[in-house]
C-alpha cells in the first residue's frame, strides 16, 4: 500500500500548464477565496518541476524506508500477549463459551464479538480487559468464541450461527442461572445480537450494543463502488474457496483508511521498543493479524446483502423467515457509539439505536478498537457499561 501510494503521487504529477485538469479547480478556489483571478502561469513558473519531483522522490523514499524499519521492528519484537486463558464453561454446537468468573449469583452477561476478528480483543491486556472488568464489577460474564468457520458446515450461514450457537448459548445460561442474560455485542456481534432480541426476547434481559453497524450506506460510497465493481471476482473467490480468506477480509477494511498502515508503522519505528507503548502495539498488531476467514454464505450476506444492498436498514435481513426489525426489541438497550470510529461510522451505529424504542445512547470520543483496548477504555466504556447493566439487573 505504501509503494502504491508513492506511485500514485508520481502518476498524479500534472503538466505545468493552465489547461491542466488540476489547475482549473485551483484557479477557481483561489478566485472564490480572494475575489481575484489566478494567473496559471504565475504560480507554476515559481515551481521548478525537476526540483519538485526530486523532493517528492526523497520524501517518498524516506517514508518507505521508515515504514520498512517499523515493520521489521514489529516482526522481530520478542514481546507477546501473555494473558491467562479463561475456563471453557461449555459449548454451543462445538463453539466454546468462555467463563470469566464472577459470583455464581451475579447477573449473567453473554458477550458476542465480531465474526471477522478473534474474540480476545475483549481480553487483550490485564488492565484493559472488558471481560475481566465486568467480572470485577460483580457480574458473571461469558464470551462466545466464534473461532473459525471450520466449526460449522461449509454451507453455514448467519441463520446457523444464530440458531445453532447464539440462541443455544442464551438457553444454557438461563437454564444454569435461572434468569436471562444481558446480551452484549461488539461490532458485527452487536448486529447479530438483534436477532435473538427479536426472535427470543425471553432469553434477553437487556441489550448492549458496542459500535454496532446497521445502516451500511451511511458512509462514503467508496467501499460500495469497489464491491460493486469487484463482485464477480469476489464471488468467484468465495465459491472456489468456500470462504472469504483472511487476506481478502483484511484488504477490505484496510481500504477504509488506506494510509493507516503506513502511519502506524512509521510511528512504531520512532518508539522506544522497550516501552509499554511499544509492547501494547505489538500485542494489538498481533491480534489484528490473527484474523479468521468468513464462511462463504456469511461473507455473501455481509459483503453483498449488508454493505452493498443495505438489507438491514431496508428490512430485508431475515433469520429463517423472520425479518429482524429493531423496532420490535422491547428490552432495555444501551448503545455505546465511538465518535472517532472509522470502521463503523457513528451514523451507522446511531441508526440502530434510534430504531429501538427507549434506547440509551452514550457517545465516547474513542475509535473502534480504542473503545475496547485503549488507555481510556476502562473509564469511558467498561465502567459505564457495567454500571448500566447492574442498574438494569436490580430493577
What is each model feature region?
Residues 184-189, 193:
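Gly/Ala-rich beta-loop-alpha elbow adjacent to hydrolase catalytic centers
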Residues 183-185, 210, 336:
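Short beta-strand immediately N-terminal to the catalytic nucleophile in serine-hydrolase-like folds
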Residues 155-175:
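Alpha/beta-hydrolase active-site loop
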Residues 343-346, 366-380:
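Catalytic histidine-centered segment of alpha/beta-hydrolase-like enzymes
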Residues 1-49, 175, 192-297:
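Alpha/beta-hydrolase-fold enzymes
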Residues 329, 335-337, 341:
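Short beta-strand/loop motif that positions the catalytic acidic residue
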Residues 74-77, 82-150:
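Short, surface-exposed "cap/lid" segments of acyl-processing enzymes
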Residues 331, 345-354:
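Short alpha-helix in the alpha/beta-hydrolase fold that links the catalytic acid
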Amino acid at each position: 500500500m505504501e509503494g502504491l501510494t508513492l506511485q500514485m503521487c508520481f502518476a498524479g504529477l500534472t503538466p505545468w500548464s493552465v489547461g491542466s485538469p488540476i489547475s482549473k479547480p485551483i484557479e477557481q478556489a483561489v478566485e472564490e477565496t480572494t475575489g481575484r483571478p489566478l494567473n496559471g502561469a504565475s504560480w507554476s513558473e515559481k515551481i521548478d518541476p525537476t526540483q519538485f519531483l526530486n523532493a517528492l522522490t526523497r520524501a517518498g523514499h524516506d517514508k518507505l524506508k521508515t515504514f520498512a524499519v517499523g515493520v521489521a521492528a514489529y516482526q522481530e519484537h520478542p514481546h507477546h500477549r501473555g494473558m491467562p486463558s479463561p475456563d471453557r464453561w461449555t459449548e454451543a454446537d462445538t463453539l466454546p463459551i468462555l467463563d470469566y468468573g464472577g459470583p455464581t449469583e451475579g447477573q449473567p452477561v453473554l458477550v458476542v464479538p465480531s465474526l471477522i476478528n478473534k474474540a480476545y480483543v475483549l481480553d487483550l491486556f490485564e488492565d484493559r480487559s472488558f471481560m475481566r472488568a465486568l467480572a470485577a464489577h460483580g457480574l458473571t460474564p461469558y464470551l462466545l468464541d466464534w473461532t473459525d468457520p471450520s466449526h460449522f458446515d461449509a454451507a453455514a450461514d448467519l441463520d446457523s450461527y444464530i440458531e445453532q450457537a447464539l440462541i443455544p448459548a442464551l438457553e444454557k445460561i438461563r437454564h444454569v442461572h435461572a434468569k436471562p442474560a444481558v446480551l452484549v455485542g461488539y461490532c458485527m456481534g452487536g448486529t447479530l445480537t438483534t436477532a435473538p432480541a427479536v426472535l427470543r426476547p425471553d432469553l434477553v434481559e437487556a441489550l448492549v450494543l458496542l459500535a454496532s453497524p446497521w445502516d451500511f450506506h451511511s458512509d462514503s460510497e467508496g467501499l460500495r463502488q469497489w464491491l460493486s465493481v469487484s463482485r464477480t471476482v469476489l464471488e468467484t473467490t468465495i465459491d472456489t474457496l468456500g470462504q472469504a480468506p483472511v487476506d481478502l477480509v483484511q484488504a477490505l477494511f484496510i481500504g477504509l483508511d488506506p494510509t493507516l498502515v503506513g502511519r502506524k508503522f512509521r510511528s512504531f519505528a520512532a518508539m522506544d521498543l522497550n516501552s509499554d507503548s511499544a509492547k501494547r502495539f505489538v500485542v494489538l498488531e498481533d491480534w489484528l493479524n490473527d484474523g479468521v476467514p468468513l464462511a462463504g454464505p456469511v461473507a455473501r450476506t455481509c459483503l453483498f446483502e449488508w454493505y452493498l444492498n443495505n438489507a438491514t436498514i431496508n428490512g430485508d435481513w431475515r433469520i429463517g423467515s423472520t425479518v429482524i426489525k429493531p423496532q420490535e426489541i422491547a428490552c432495555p438497550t444501551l448503545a455505546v457509539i465511538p465518535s472517532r470510529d472509522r470502521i463503523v461510522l457513528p451514523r451507522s451505529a446511531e441508526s440502530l439505536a434510534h430504531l429501538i424504542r427507549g434506547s440509551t445512547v452514550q457517545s465516547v470520543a474513542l475509535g473502534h478498537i480504542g473503545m475496547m483496548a485503549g488507555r481510556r477504555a476502562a473509564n469511558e466504556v467498561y465502567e459505564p457499561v457495567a454500571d448500566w447493566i447492574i442498574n438494569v439487573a436490580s430493577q
